[in-house]
């Protein structure tokens, strides 16, 4: 059983009130859902938010992997919590799991600037202030671009001047020098090289137009994507349920264009298994579009029918979404006022509604306000409060 929880990070004491010399209060982490460990019989069921101690400093970014959560603070430190058997906590230890956040141990002088989001399923990636990438955790498929099977502390990848990174169950993607690189398993063409060959070293993705820069990378279990500065979005990899969004169900080892309305602002891929996955895209007008597997209602269009082309999510009247995220069989959005909405599968409480509803095919209010949301598989983290950057 993997560690599954929904977490809410509540940032306190970071407003403009009080003396300017006062340090920000520590971040408080809450979790609920099912907490367990791989292969463990016992598990902890939490149906109400429960604090997780340990994070110190002002959190500026959050990220999730299959069984872990990560928080980057304004000082460049990274904190981790969750399953630790593969070294995912990055502190040299590997207990079953940790419900308390622990500090990831980078070499002296390394200051992290951003986290991959989502993270590799059983590992983690972070970009430092110099553009170097660090990875830790499980590297069984070469998806961390490292040579070892497991890394219990961060190791530097053979990449530099990296601006973006994202990970999944089988592979990772990086943007540097105007190009996109990938490593890991090449099954279904997920590396985007034109073949299904695997590579434990970074290889260039082929077929992306060079007329616009890459502004975001997306990934799911066996899918990849890139959003360009002109609003064009491209997918590649597995496609049996229409995950590529191009009107086909044929896999593609090269990027294919997804026909979306103008004004795409954010895209997020989800999926927790080798044969599922969905993608959410949010436009400047607040509308949300989704495509791919829909067996649990995760597309949010009121049905449970998969789609190989983008469909419009049934957004409640008067609500404008500004951020989206997508996990295993569930999807999430934050509206203009900060309210969190969720839809899809809820068997592990990952919708966070506290209700007995097992499936929601349209967005439902979670009853909490957030500024950031991240989800991977059944693991969700949210940040509440002001930060120094989005």
What are these regions (language model features)?
Residues 10-13:
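C-terminal motif of bacterial Sec signal peptides marking the signal peptidase cleavage site
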Residues 15-17:
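Bacterial signal peptide processing site
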């Amino acid at each position: 059983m993997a560690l599954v929880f929904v977490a809410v990070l509540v940032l306190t004491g970071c407003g403009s009130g009080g003396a300017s010399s006062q340090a920000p209060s520590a971040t408080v982490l809450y979790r609920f859902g099912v907490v367990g460990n791989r292969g463990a019989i016992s598990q902890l069921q939490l149906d109400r938010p429960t604090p997780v101690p340990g994070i110190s400093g002002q959190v500026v970014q959050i990220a999730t992997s299959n069984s872990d959560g990560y928080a980057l603070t304004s000082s460049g430190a990274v904190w981790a919590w969750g399953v630790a058997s593969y070294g995912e906590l990055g502190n040299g230890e590997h207990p079953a799991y940790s419900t308390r956040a622990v500090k990831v141990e980078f070499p002296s002088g390394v200051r992290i600037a951003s986290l991959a989001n989502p993270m590799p399923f059983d590992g983690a990636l972070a970009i430092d202030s110099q553009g170097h990438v660090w990875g830790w955790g499980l590297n069984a498929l070469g998806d961390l671009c490292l040579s070892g099977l497991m890394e219990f502390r961060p190791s530097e990848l053979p990449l530099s001047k990296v601006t973006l990174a994202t990970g999944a169950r089988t592979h990772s993607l990086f943007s540097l020098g105007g190009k996109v690189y990938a490593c890991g398993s090449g099954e279904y063409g997920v590396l985007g090289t034109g073949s299904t060959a695997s590579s434990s070293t970074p290889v260039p993705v082929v077929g992306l137009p060079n007329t616009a820069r890459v502004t975001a990378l997306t990934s799911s279990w066996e899918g990849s994507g890139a959003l360009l500065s002109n609003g064009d979005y491209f997918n590649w990899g597995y496609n049996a349920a229409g995950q590529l969004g191009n009107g086909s169900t044929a896999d593609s080892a090269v990027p294919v264009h997804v026909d979306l309305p103008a004004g795409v602002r954010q895209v997020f891929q989800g999926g927790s298994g080798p044969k599922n996955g969905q993608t959410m895209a949010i436009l400047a007008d607040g509308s949300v579009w989704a495509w791919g597997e829909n067996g649990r209602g995760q597309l949010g269009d009121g049905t449970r029918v998969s789609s190989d082309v983008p469909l419009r999510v049934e957004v409640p009247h008067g609500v404008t979404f500004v951020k989206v995220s997508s996990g295993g069989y569930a999807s999430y959005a934050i509206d203009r006022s900060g309210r969190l909405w969720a839809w899809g599968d809820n068997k592990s409480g990952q919708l966070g509604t506290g209700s007995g509803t097992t499936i929601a095919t349209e967005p439902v209010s979670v009853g909490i306000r957030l500024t950031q949301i991240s989800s991977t598989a059944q693991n969700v983290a949210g940040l509440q409060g002001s930060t120094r950057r989005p």
